[in-house]
Amino acid sequence: MQGSVTEFLKPRLVDIEQVSLTHAKVTLEPLERGFGHTLGNALRRILLSSMPGCAVTEVEIEGVLHEYSTKEGVQEDILEILLNLKGLAVKVEGKDEVIITLNKSGAGPVVAGDITHDGDVEIANPEHVICHLTDDNAEISMRIKVERGRGYVPSTARIHTEEDERPIGRLLVDATYSPVDKISYAVEAARVEQRTDLDKLVIDMETNGTLDPEEAIRRAATILAEQLDAFVDLRDVRVPEEKEEKPEFDPILLRPVDDLELTVRSANCLKAEAIHYIGDLVQRTEVELLKTPNLGKKSLTEIKDVLASRGLSLGMRLENWPPASIAED
């Protein structure tokens, strides 16, 4: 059925071709023309950089004080062992970090399958070689810390925060948390009914075996959708800064003239002239007050001194006086 010309086609997951246990091809179609590259590039970048996973972050090897040393009876030097440990594909359920141990003796390869761990830890590449012991008397013991994270975090990024409490012999490892090792995409032609200008997106993905390809696509799409949510509703959701409202008038101007504690004679003269608030008083001039019946120079001097003690004076101009709160009274 022919849809509206403005209606976008919605892609669907067409096929998951499992090339191997760690290699899959995921096909999505149909896509509007150009959307294959738009979505393919976005998903590719997220799958490479933003997938959560687990990685080795710290190692303690018995008898080893620093990474620039060797261990008797072990073919590889310590730096090479640390590099091999970065290749461990570990999956941890329900925890953010775990400690796993490795104890091996006797000539031969030491592999990931020799590691001892709890039931909530799964090693996806048990055949991965960590090192080689060169004689029957050789042995190696290590404690390996595995943490959950995202992306790539070099050991140098953690040195400054951990060096004060990190004991000698605890070796830091560059952490590659992403379970996706390689990813590429291709855009091919697709057809729906009479339309032949559509895209088909084929994502070619290799993982370390700890994440299912279909789940990886689902997680990447969820991350992308969450990041785009802000563009769906472009209203400014920032919390506005609360501006402190400054009072229109100095609070002292709103106080009654009785608070000035004038003499009874002076106070009565002011009330007779309907001067009830200090704000009313400071707007009067000396000439105006001297015209007030029974208010002489002595009372005027008293009023001026009391106002001056409060940083006020006669003859002040107050815009918008009286305020609404006083006017209503």
Swiss-Prot record:
GO biological process: DNA-templated transcription
One MF term in the entry's GO annotations: protein dimerization activity
GO cellular component annotations of the record: cytoplasm; DNA-directed RNA polymerase complex
Reactions catalysed according to its record: RNA(n) + a ribonucleoside 5'-triphosphate = RNA(n+1) + diphosphate
Highest taxon listed in the record's lineage: Bacteria
SUPFAM superfamilies: C-terminal domain of RNA polymerase alpha subunit, Insert subdomain of RNA polymerase alpha subunit, RBP11-like subunits of RNA polymerase
InterPro entries in the cross-refs: DNA-dir_RNA_pol_insert (IPR011262), DNA-dir_RNA_pol_RpoA/D/Rpb3 (IPR011263), DNA-dir_RpoA (IPR011773), RBP11-like (IPR036603), RNAP_asu_C (IPR011260), RNApol_insert_sf (IPR036643)
Keywords annotated in UniProt: DNA-directed RNA polymerase, Nucleotidyltransferase, Transcription, Transferase
EC number, as in UniProt: 2.7.7.6
Homology family: Belongs to the RNA polymerase alpha chain family.
Comment on protein domains: The N-terminal domain is essential for RNAP assembly and basal transcription, whereas the C-terminal domain is involved in interaction with transcriptional regulators and with upstream promoter elements.
Name of the protein this chain belongs to: DNA-directed RNA polymerase subunit alpha
Organism: Aliivibrio salmonicida (strain LFI1238)
